[in-house]
Amino acid sequence: MDAKAQAAARPFEHTVIVRPTTFQAGCAIGTDKWVEFQSLYQLLVDDETQNRAICEEVVRAVRDGRSPLILTERNEHLDRFEGVLSASVPHVVVLRGGMGKKQRRTEAERLAAIPREEGRVILATGKYIGEGFDDPRLDTLFLTLPVSWRGTIAQ
């Protein structure tokens, strides 16, 4: 079943909200698109204005009773978000590639133990959260970096 058919079958509505920003890469595009894409990632990770705006939106979502997943591709970005969001959100759970089986199990248990009425946010890399991760409470997705192919979003 393709992503559109799956979305149509779900008992909830999908809404995409685009947040225009003032971000400007400020550099010329080179001939190696992969290198340029990685450079763009780093510029976005380092953009404090952009990151602050994302964190404000996440905190607002949690206060509105949402259970968001913040998705990035950079561990450094996860660390930055964790540092800011931990001051405002009671439960910040970070999931990233390279976590051992024991650590993954510990984080899964921690997630399961968070009461529904308590605010929480999951920060994760796409590589970790891809196939096989399921959390029925997730209802909001923040894509903090551009994606380079459609399959990333479909998952």
Residue ranges and their predicted role:
Residues 148-155:
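Conserved SF2 helicase motif VI
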Residues 1-17:
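Post-DEXD/H (motif II) to motif III coupling segment of the RecA-like Helicase ATP-binding lobe
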Residues 29-73, 79-84:
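Conserved interdomain hinge at the start of the Helicase C-terminal
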Residues 8-10, 60-63, 86, 112-117, ...:
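Conserved catalytic network of the ASCE P-loop NTPase/AAA+ motor domain
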Residues 12-40, 84-89:
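Short, basic/glycine-rich phosphate-binding loops at helix/coil junctions
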Residues 123, 131-146:
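A short beta-strand element within the Helicase C-terminal
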Residues 61-68, 89-91, 136-139:
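Short, surface-exposed connector motifs at secondary-structure boundaries
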Residues 69, 79-80, 89-130, 152:
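Conserved helicase ATPase core of P-loop NTP-dependent helicases/translocases
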